[in-house]
Amino acid sequence: MDCKIKAAGKNSGIFHEGGTKSSKSFLTVFIRSVFPLSPSFPAGGGIWGPMEKKPGGVGKKKGSEKKTAQGNIFFSTERDAGQEKCGILYKHCFSILYGFFWKKADKPKEKTGNGSGLGIVFPIGQKKIPEPADSDIFLPCFRYAAASDFTKAKRFLVEITAVYWVSLEAQPSSASCLFILI
């Protein structure tokens, strides 16, 4: 596994060291490392939420449906005495981790330079994407992701090497979501 987790004080960082990995293995490493005692995470099970049926898109036969994986993992901030060692992360870094979901680029490979365009968004705390005025390292990645320009988003992540979770308590107006391209 070419992904390592660092958790220290009020900030927890996710380091990308190159290579490829499945979204499932990446999230398994992340969730098991940061939330080792969370009862919301199925022990030994998968991390994808229930499949949600949606109407078929253009070119689909009438009545056909397609399924999309929906992340449906929720972590409560209330922990019992046996889970105190996770408290600092819940309190300072992740007041509530609302879940995750994935999306694919709308543009074809020849335009984006990225075949899969698979990304994961972790909304944290307030459900708000930062305004352009906010000075935060996440912003370029958010703009690229919003424009489906996954090549630039991926290059941005490679350039900064590490993507940090920002403490909502220390910087309440900072990023409340984190986009990771894999």
From Swiss-Prot:
Residues 46-65 are annotated as: Disordered. Multicopy expression suppresses glucose-uptake defects in various yeast mutants. This is Hexose transport activator protein. The lineage of its organism: Eukaryota, Fungi, Dikarya, Ascomycota, Saccharomycotina.
